[in-house]
Amino acid sequence: MHGSVRREGESPSTYSIADNVYMNSKIHAIITGDIVRSESIGLDKRDGLIKTLRCALEDLQRQSSMKMEMYRGDSFQIIVDNPVKSLRIASMLRAYLIGNAPEDEKNGWDARISIGIGAINYKGESIVVSDGEAFRLSGRGLDNIEKDRLAVATCWEDVNEEVDASIGFVDNLITSLSRNQARLIYLAVAEELPQVEIAGRTGKSQQNISKTLNAAKEPLLSRYLNRFESLITKYCGQ
């Protein structure tokens, strides 16, 4: 991957969820991302990767309506109408990719993701022609992400100070997940299923589910996401 921000003149492919449904608030979240080590993914697996990404976005509609466009083959940008849920969506998008990578994919699947939360001054039919602070924060964040895989920037300095000091925890937690941990943490955090229901769905004992989720630090992740969502809710309401 040689960049992170959509370049003028690039023709994105669009995958929309609730294209014309937007919050009344002018504050939105923009998720800009690209696939980690995309150049090493075989051509025979590219279609499966894109399908997995789209399936994740469709399922995560339970958290917020969204619109996604892909460009350059390995990059994507998403407008998230409910910024409160943006970090949950971004982290669970990564977990979905990790958990659904083919067993024979040596390096697995993952994405580098930057979240920008702020105003959108102009919202066109296509994300490529839209503009605003949220887009700039998200694009700049991915350009500067270096070796990390998750970044968040908002239009509120107080929020940025708190998030900057702690977002590395979420990044490291998601990056460290095994395929099995990622699949279970997705059910617990994205679908918000109780452990007994996860056990029934996966055919594993509740004891096994609890042990795996604790090893994956799911309770700490859920607590952090709840704190982030409370913080963004507070500032969006000001």
What do the predicted segments below correspond to?
Residues 2-6, 10-238:
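Regulatory and interdomain segments flanking nucleotide-handling catalytic cores
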